[in-house]
Amino acid sequence: MAINLITEYQKKIAERFTLGSLTDEAAGHDYDFTGVKTIEIFSIDTVATVDYTRSGTTRYGNVTELGDTKQSLTLAVDKGFTFSIDAGNASEQFNIKQANRCLKREWDEVCTPEIDAYRLKSWANGKGLSSGKAVLSNTDASLTKANIVDAIFNGSAAMSDKKVPRKNRYLFIPELTFVKFKLADVVMAHQMNKEAVQNGFKGTIDGMKVVTVPSSIWPTLTGGGTINFMIKYKGATVDPMKLKNLRVQKNPMGIDGDVVEGRYIYDSFVKDSACDGIYISTGSTSGGSSVGA
């Protein structure tokens, strides 16, 4: 890694662009992994209704023990990073490498996009789903300005047909694909939210918050195939950030300067009981079981 010592260069740092987290608002944070690596989520069964009988000892029907299903989720992602800022180098670079700022820069530029990419891929591919479970999907081939509006509204309708709540839905769509929506002959401009754009949100479509995603972190199907867009209900997933330790050590043994360290443990899973809360539009028929277990 190069160390560029200062001659007569400017003290101002040329910062790179960052977006902040694109997925955190839509992530599910309802379950606590504190102190454990694996949790088990129970879903309680229901029973069918019967016609009431006005005589006999089974007037309400035959009694059966109420069942349940269990989904085990185990954290698998354990990441870390470290770098040093030597005191001698720092003194010859106008002290432009401030440890705390460099730590924040590392988190914003490297860690946050990595977490976003992992979550998007996990959601789209139904990570953690039990056998026989899958997210909703439809093959729309290549989207154009002529068919993209229909495809998005059909996806929203498919989720509504499965009784997925309309509140807390998010439409994740690549930046360049969203251009096709804006250029569509029938653009629902009056439905677009006029509030200031924050963290990638571009208003709402059919009640869904729009989040445009750079191509660099947009997911593909695990088994091969492209994804046009994804609709997600917030409560459909479990997205723990169990550990996030970021620190600066001043002059640790053997080093004259600062040592920056970071470690974070996280993962992302789709709940069996809420797998209909994710819908993907695919651009190919390959992949099949890649959208579920």
Describe the predicted segments one by one:
Residues 46, 71-97, 152-183:
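Structured, hydrophobic secondary-structure cores that serve as assembly/anchoring elements
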Residues 66-87, 110-114, 122-127:
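A glycine-rich, hydrophobic loop/mini-helix early in the fold
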Residues 2-25, 30-52, 71-76, 94, ...:
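Sequence/fold signature of self-assembling virion shell proteins
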